[in-house]
């Protein structure tokens, strides 16, 4: 014990002073089974006991010292987890104990969850140190489930849905890939995955046509398929059944508004057209003769760049029945729904050549065509039907560049031709086809809806890139054959609006048939009438670039003479010697200048329906435009003029809602026979009431807030600035209306606006905040009465302004003099106020100076007394002896204070040393008690072990 105490004392003596109460360690040994007995010292060494690996017991012998990094954990296991040591260090000084023989643990332990009380036996401190190892082997037998699909019998209905059989790579049995189902009337399934089947060696039926059910909602979104060439055989009966099944689908894209947005014009072949030959209404909208291998996805058709193709339609044989309606419906047709995707499609440059070789055209043939979808009839039709067999050829023009690049190209060299007529894009085309059997067809666009007709004309006016060329032979109209060659070329630039790029012009052959003699006489008289319209616009036609020429048709002169009385007409003077006097460039600039002047005249007169374009009187009325011309040459328009006209048309379209409303009104009036009267009345009222409406609107906006206190009218003062060309004849001068005293005859009883608002505008119920109805009536009557009174006063002032004009200058001078006097008085008062402020400041400064002088005077009177006090203060207060005495007293006092402080420090040091000694004594006593407690615990443990041995002996016995 003495050696251990000395050792601890040497350890506790450290160089730095530490608080011993803080470094005391809790050396109490836990009595629970989870804690082990160990003791930690202040050095980096651990004391452990030797462990007998063979016997599994701890040897009570001299401990072994290990380093700190190889210490044991709190549960007794080392870091290497190879041994289990007991950290009990009691009995170091006792005699070594011989190792015990290994005794097997005979007790049983239930590890089940139900008998949870047995769990505590794991931590029983009385049990033996033998380690019990439990090994649990769980043997699980897994069942291997192998699933595969066997062959489905051929005739069952489940063969259509056997999709899993396609992916069965283990079973090499033959899989039924038939999509028919084996039953009559069943729908065919689009077995797309059969293409990728590696196990199927049989040919796959790729016919994906589905018979349209009665109520098929999703059928709207399906694209119609084209049968393969192997199935298109007219001799086979099965092929005809498949064709009839494929044609059972509704291919009319105009009947469904939703399909019009998703279907492409190039989705049907000529075979599908042949199946509808027994139908009277042959709606061939969007049908293009395309091979099956060239058919692409309908969705990608929206993004394709259109190709310029030339489609030639030749009538070879057969007769057209009277009830055949070859209608190609597009945007221009008011009966058809709107094609949503049509505005995003780029129109193709196509050339249609219609040559009539034989046969007769019946009276009721309606061939309405739009340029959105080109008609291509069927090439093969059976003879047992009365349909027309037409030959369809499609050629691609060589050398045709992109439509978009045509905008940026330089204009070609212009070549002047003796052509006469001028054709504008905004004009309505009326063409006459003269037949040898004295039958005249008038081709006119006459929609049923007048409002839609006016909007269609507006869209026609926005077409800026269309060139119309008419080729007509010089033969006599009576001896010419029934052959008309018409070429139509579209050249729409990509820089225009989508609406303008969609060509909505519709050309019809009406049902009214006229005689050839009447048509010839009308055309001959048309050149002699003053309504003859002709103008020359020339440009060079480049082969392969400009394409073919446009169509211009001659209109019926009777319709011109009838419409000229009820609507404005285009009068264009022909320049016969244009080719000799001016070149192509000057001629083009002249036409551009005329079009610009037309736009300026429209903007100045605010009449978009009436445009004057030339000194001779070029007048265009988009609501009803007619053209009469006898074509004898080729006319074309250069690209520059088209671009200039496009800019002009875009500027004219800025007021399209207003013009469309006017045209709608005029169209409605024209049905009742009052178009000319309504137009004349509109123009007259607009010219007369242009400024009157402005003044009325200003007076009505003032309302009940207008009173006598309101002076000049700002809007009336700015009348000359707002419209210098149209000054009101009744508007008085603002100065006169201000200076002239009001006449008692037109005096209005003054009122207070606040009182009126309180009396008449107070709601009956403050919670509901609903005003009295009489308040609104009073406000309306008051505003109307006051506006009338002001008008009468202004009229009277204007009538007597001549008499007052002589005294006006004098009154103005008096007013100016009075204003000058008021200004002078204001300046005088301002000057007086500033002078008063300056004088007050000077007075304050003088008073402060006077106070300072008074104080100085008082100080000068007490000067002698002050000098005596200064002298006394300047004299020394202490002598040398007194100063030394005071210094000595100071030093003595300081020494006494230092001595007292030193004595206090010594007493405190002695007290501190006493406390330290007492603390050391207490620490030693505590250590002794701890050692005694440890010995007692060791003895108690040994007694418990003896008791356990006795109990085991009893149990063994």
Curated annotation (Swiss-Prot):
* One GO CC term, this protein: kinetochore
The residue range of the signal peptide is: none
Provide the residue intervals of the sequence repeats: 87-90, 109-112, 206-209, 251-254, 282-285, 326-329, 367-370, 390-393
Principal location: cytoplasm
- Biological process annotations from GO: cell division; chromosome segregation; meiotic cell cycle; negative regulation of mitotic spindle assembly checkpoint signaling
As recorded in UniProt, coiled-coil segments are 830-950
**Subcellular location(s) per record:** Cytoplasm, Cell cortex; Chromosome, Centromere, Kinetochore
Q: Which GO terms describe its molecular function?
A: microtubule binding
Map out region (8 X 4 AA repeats of M-[D/E]-[I/L/M]-[S/T]) in residue numbers: 87-393
Q: Where is this region: Disordered?
A: 89-111, 476-504
Keyword Iron-sulfur on entry: no
Instruction: Provide the alphabetized UniProt keywords.
Output: Cell cycle, Cell division, Centromere, Chromosome, Chromosome partition, Coiled coil, Cytoplasm, Kinetochore, Meiosis, Mitosis, Repeat
Biased composition (Polar residues) is annotated at 91-106
Q: What is known of its domains?
A: The N-terminus contains a number of repeats which contribute additively to bub-1 recruitment to unattached kinetochores. The repeats are not required for localization to kinetochores.
Q: How does it assemble?
A: Component of the KNL1 complex composed of knl-1 and kbp-5. Part of the ten-subunit outer kinetochore KMN network that includes the KNL1, MIS12 and NDC80 complexes. Interacts with the protein phosphatase 1 (PP1) catalytic subunit gsp-1; the interaction is direct. Interacts with the protein phosphatase 1 (PP1) catalytic subunit gsp-2; the interaction is direct. Interacts with the MIS12 complex subunits kbp-1, kbp-2 and mis-12. Interacts with the NDC80 complex components ndc-80 and him-10. Interacts with knl-3. Interacts with kbp-3. Interacts with kbp-4. Interacts with kbp-5.
Query: What does the record give as the function of this protein?
Result: Acts as a component of the outer kinetochore KNL1 complex that serves as a docking point for spindle assembly checkpoint components and mediates microtubule-kinetochore interactions. Kinetochores, consisting of a centromere-associated inner segment and a microtubule-contacting outer segment, play a crucial role in chromosome segregation by mediating the physical connection between centromeric DNA and spindle microtubules.
- The protein in question is named Outer kinetochore KNL1 complex subunit knl-1
Native source species: Caenorhabditis briggsae
Which gene produces this protein?
knl-1
């Amino acid at each position: 014990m003495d050696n251990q105490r000395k050792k601890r004392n040497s350890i506790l003596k450290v160089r730095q002073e530490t608080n011993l109460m803080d470094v005391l360690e809790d050396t109490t040994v836990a009595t629970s089974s989870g804690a082990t007995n160990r003791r930690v010292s202040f050095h980096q060494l651990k004391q452990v006991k030797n462990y007998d690996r063979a016997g599994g017991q701890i040897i009570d012998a001299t401990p072994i010292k290990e380093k700190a990094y190889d210490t044991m954990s709190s549960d007794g296991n080392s870091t290497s987890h190879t041994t289990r040591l007991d950290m009990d260090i009691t009995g170091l000084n006792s005699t070594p104990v011989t190792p015990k023989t290994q005794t097997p643990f005979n007790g049983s332990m239930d590890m089940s969850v139900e008998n949870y009380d047995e769990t505590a036996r794991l931590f029983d401190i009385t049990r033996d140190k033998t380690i019990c190892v439990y090994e649990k082997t769980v043997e699980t037998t897994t069942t291997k489930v192998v699933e595969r699909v066997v062959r489905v019998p051929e005739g069952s209905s489940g063969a259509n849905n056997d999709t899993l059989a396609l992916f069965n790579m283990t079973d090499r049995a033959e899989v039924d890939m038939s999509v028919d189902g084996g039953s009559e009337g069943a729908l065919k399934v689009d077995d797309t995955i059969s293409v990728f089947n590696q196990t199927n060696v049989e040919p796959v039926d790729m016919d994906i046509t589905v018979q349209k059910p009665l109520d098929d909602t999703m059928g709207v979104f399906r694209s119609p398929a084209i049968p393969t060439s192997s199935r298109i055989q007219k001799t086979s009966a099965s092929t005809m059944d498949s064709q009839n099944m494929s044609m059972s689908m509704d291919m009319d894209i105009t009947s469904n508004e939703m399909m019009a947005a998703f279907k492409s014009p190039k989705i049907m072949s000529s075979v599908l057209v042949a199946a509808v030959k027994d139908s009277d209404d042959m709606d061939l909208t969007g049908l293009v003769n395309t091979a099956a291998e060239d058919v692409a996805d309908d969705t990608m058709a929206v993004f394709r760049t259109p190709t310029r193709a030339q489609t030639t339609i030749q009538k070879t044989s057969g007769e057209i029945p009277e009830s055949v309606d070859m209608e190609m419906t597009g945007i221009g047709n008011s009966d058809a729904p709107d094609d949503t995707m049509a505005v995003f499609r780029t129109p193709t440059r196509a050339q249609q050549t219609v040559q009539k070789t034989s046969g007769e055209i019946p009276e009721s043939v309606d061939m309405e065509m739009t340029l959105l979808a080109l008609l291509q009839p069927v090439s093969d039709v059976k003879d047992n039907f009365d349909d027309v067999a037409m030959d369809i050829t499609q050629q691609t023009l060589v050398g045709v560049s992109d439509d978009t690049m045509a905008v940026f190209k330089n204009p070609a060299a212009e070549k002047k031709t003796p052509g006469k007529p001028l054709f504008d894009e905004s004009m309505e085309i009326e063409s006459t086809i003269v037949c040898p059997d004295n039958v005249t067809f008038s081709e006119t666009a006459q929609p049923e809806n007048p409002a839609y007709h006016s909007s269609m004309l507006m869209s026609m006016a926005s077409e800026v890139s269309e060139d119309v060329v008419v080729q007509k032979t010089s033969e006599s109209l009576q001896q010419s054959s029934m052959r008309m060659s018409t070429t139509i070329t579209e050249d729409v630039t990509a820089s225009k609006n989508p609406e303008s790029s969609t060509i909505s012009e519709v050309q019809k052959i009406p049902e009214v048939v006229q005689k050839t003699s009447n048509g010839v006489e009308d055309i001959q008289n048309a050149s002699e009438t003053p309504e003859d319209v002709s103008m020359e616009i020339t440009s060079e036609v480049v082969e392969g670039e400009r394409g073919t020429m446009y169509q211009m048709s001659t209109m019926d002169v009777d319709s011109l003479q009838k419409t000229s009385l009820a609507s404005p007409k285009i009068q264009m003077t022909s320049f016969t010697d244009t080719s000799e006097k001016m070149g192509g460039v000057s001629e083009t600039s002249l036409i551009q200048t005329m079009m610009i002047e037309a736009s300026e005249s429209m903007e100045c007169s605010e009449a978009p329906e009436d445009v004057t374009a030339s000194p001779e009187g070029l007048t265009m009325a988009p609501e009803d435009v007619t053209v009469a011309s006898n074509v004898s040459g080729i006319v074309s328009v250069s690209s520059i003029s088209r671009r200039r006209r496009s800019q002009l048309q875009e500027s004219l379209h800025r007021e399209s809602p207003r013009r469309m409303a006017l045209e709608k009104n005029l169209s409605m009036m024209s049905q009742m026979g009052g178009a000319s009267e309504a137009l004349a009345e509109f123009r007259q009222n607009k010219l007369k009431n242009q400024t009157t409406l402005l003044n009325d609107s200003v007076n009505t906006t003032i309302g009940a807030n207008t009173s006598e206190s309101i002076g000049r009218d700002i809007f009336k003062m700015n009348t000359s600035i707002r419209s210098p060309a149209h000054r009101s004849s009744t508007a008085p001068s603002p100065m006169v209306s201000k200076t002239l005293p009001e006449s008692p005859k037109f005096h209005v009883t003054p009122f207070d606006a606040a009182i009126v608002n309180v009396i008449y505008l107070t709601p009956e119920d403050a919670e509901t905040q609903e005003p009295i109805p009489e308040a609104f009536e009073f406000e309306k009557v008051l505003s109307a009465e006051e506006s009338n009174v002001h008008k009468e006063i202004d009229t009277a002032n204007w009538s007597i302004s001549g008499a007052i004009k002589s005294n006006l200058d004098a009154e103005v001078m008096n007013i100016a003099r009075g204003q000058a006097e008021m200004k002078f008085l204001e300046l005088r008062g301002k000057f007086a106020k500033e002078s008063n402020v300056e004088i007050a400041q000077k007075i304050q400064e003088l008073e402060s100076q006077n106070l300072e002088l008074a104080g100085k005077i008082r100080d000068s009177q007490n000067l002698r007394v002050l000098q005596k006090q200064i002298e006394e203060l300047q004299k020394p207060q202490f002598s040398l002896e007194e100063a030394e005495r005071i210094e000595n007293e100071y030093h003595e006092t300081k020494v006494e204070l230092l001595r007292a402080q030193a004595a206090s420090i010594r007493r405190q040091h002695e007290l501190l040393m006493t406390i330290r000694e007492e603390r050391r004594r207490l620490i030693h006593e505590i250590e002794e008690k701890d050692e005694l407690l440890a010995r007692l615990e060791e003895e108690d443990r040994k007694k418990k072990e003896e008791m356990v041995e006795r109990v085991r002996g009893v149990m063994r016995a």
